[in-house]
Amino acid sequence: MALVHLTALAACGLLLVILRAAFNSWRLQRKLPPGPPGAPLIGNILQLPKVRAHQKFTEWARTYGGLYSFRIGPATAAVVTDRALVKELFDKRSALYSSRPTSYVGQNIITRGDHLLVMDYSDNWRLFRKAINQHFMASMCEKTHVRLLEAEHTQMMRDFLLHPEKHMLHTKRTTNSIIMSLLFGIRTPSWDTPHMQELYEIMEIWSQIMETGATPPVDIFPWLHWVPQQWLGHWVDRSQTVARGMKRLYSSFHRRAIEARRKAESTSQSRARTFLDDVLDLQEKLGLTDNQVDFLGGVMMEGGSDTGSTMLLVMIQALALHPEIQQRARAELDAVCGEHRSPTWEDFPRLPYINMIVKETMRWRPVTPLAFPHALNKDDWVNGYFLPKGTTVFLNVWGLHHDENIFPNPDQFDPSRFEGRHKLAFDYAASPDYMQRDHYIYGAGRRLCPGIHLSERSMFLGAAKLLWAFNFEPARDEDGNPIRIDTDPVTGYTEGFLVCPRPYQCNVTPRSPAHAETILREFSRAESEVLSQYAMP
């Protein structure tokens, strides 16, 4: 009898513990930031679009404010569209907000956990970041990499001059060749180079799969693993296609780098030192697996190829629609460079309007309109609201860039917004004054893009050389009428967590015969003095 009483007492105690935990959970949920009402059990999952989630998140931000929350089943998500909170959470509380949400697709199927973008905040993450920072820090870019940047952007001018109808490909070749040369010592000499085509095909599918809402939420509802994948958009097959493509491409360049090192050592051949040389020298000491080395090079190949090329294509769109901006930029360029030399990195301090155009391009149509989500690794309170451990936290780049209180008429392309802000993006990202932040395309906090220093210099040189060399205007139809360039955020750009302009027509013409002559002369010198130091595929 006593045993029965003890059992009943224990059961009551357990029930009280469960009820208390449930009550505490309910009480804390009531203290979450405001947000859209959801359905029982599933939360807001049916309200989330499969594409362009940044548009929905920005719509909700106008209703619920700079910090709001929503539910995906039992999981909590929060969206930050407030400059002060970006600084407070991602920078000042970066130790709490630097992890990544669990991603079965990204971490298990595609990368085996070795991709820096989806890697959790850990010792391996810090190791990867340190390796990248050492090779792509500002001083290395200034001392070593700028020479290659100038040479590749000089070829880009030559390519635009000879084949203006392929403008959508020239920027991709340029940025891909820059990063391939720095990573592996192998150039991308033309737009039809196989490794470039393969990378962009992989990147397109990877971007679509990793967009918020694009795959079933198996991390939250594990039972979805048992639902036939053909009912859910063949998400496993698509993920495995990306995994195979990445592994094949990234490991092939890993092997080529090893072969090139052996050949150089056996023949005493001179070759440009690369990022992978540094990694291979330390691989055994650091305990890096071959798969980790593959993805160290691969993640930089992705980031270095896609962001810069897309932003240059966006800039050309805007320039073609705004001849007055071209006119002001050329007045500045002509005063500094004349027509017998193109701009170099040394001209940066004297070309502030070019830098303003770059900043406005990144603000206007950001390539990452919804930065890759962060995860909270500990319970936190923000302005009286509770965010539980494990909350997925989105940095709403699109919403920040199109905040009418900060950027009046945000859909208008207007470089003068950045009058007086002539430093590079890193300086403003590191500034304690969050109102001075120019844009958020590189992310925030400890997850700030490690390629920011290279990207900023490359973007400036690409913009400066193209504006110095060419006139841009909409193409014309058979009747001489301008063909519309679609810059609508929905119809004019691709889907995915990385967005790119859809193909558009544009007339590109050299500004004068003297400019054309200078382009060819400078390319000949760049080819013999710089580009020839790197291997051909």
Curated annotation (Swiss-Prot):
Cofactor(s) of this protein:
heme
Which EC class does it fall in? oxidoreductase
Under InterPro entries, the record lists: Cyt_P450 (IPR001128), Cyt_P450_E_grp-I (IPR002401), Cyt_P450_sf (IPR036396), Cytochrome_P450_fung (IPR050364)
Q: What does gene deletion cause?
A: Loses the ability to produce yanuthone D. Also leads to the loss of production of yanuthone X1 which does not have 6-methylsalicylic acid (6-MSA) as a precursor.
Provide the binding site for heme. Answer: C449
Q: Which UniProt keyword terms apply here?
A: Heme, Iron, Metal-binding, Monooxygenase, Oxidoreductase, Signal
Q: Which Pfam families match?
A: p450 (PF00067)
GO-annotated biological processes: terpenoid biosynthetic process
Tell me which EC number(s) this protein carries: 1.-.-.-
- Tell whether Iron is among the UniProt keywords: yes
Task: Give the Gene Ontology MF terms in alphabetical order.
Answer: heme binding; iron ion binding; monooxygenase activity; oxidoreductase activity, acting on paired donors, with incorporation or reduction of molecular oxygen
Pathway(s): Secondary metabolite biosynthesis; terpenoid biosynthesis
Report the biotech usage: Yanuthone D is an antibiotic against C.albicans, methicillin-resistant S.aureus (MRSA), and vancomycin-resistant Enterococcus.
Q: Where is the signal peptide?
A: 1-21
What is the documented function of this protein? Answer: Cytochrome P450 monooxygenase; part of the gene cluster that mediates the biosynthesis of yanuthone D, a fungal isoprenoid epoxycyclohexenone that acts as an antibiotic against fungi and bacteria. The first step of the pathway is the synthesis of 6-methylsalicylic acid (6-MSA) by the polyketide synthase yanA. 6-MSA is then converted to m-cresol by the decarboxylase yanB. The cytochrome P450 monooxygenase yanC then catalyzes the oxidation of m-cresol to toluquinol.
The family assignment reads:
Belongs to the cytochrome P450 family.
For this protein, the record's PANTHER family field holds: CYTOCHROME P450 MONOOXYGENASE ALNH-RELATED, P450, PUTATIVE (EUROFUNG)-RELATED-RELATED
This one is known as Cytochrome P450 monooxygenase yanC
Name the gene for this chain.
Answer: yanC
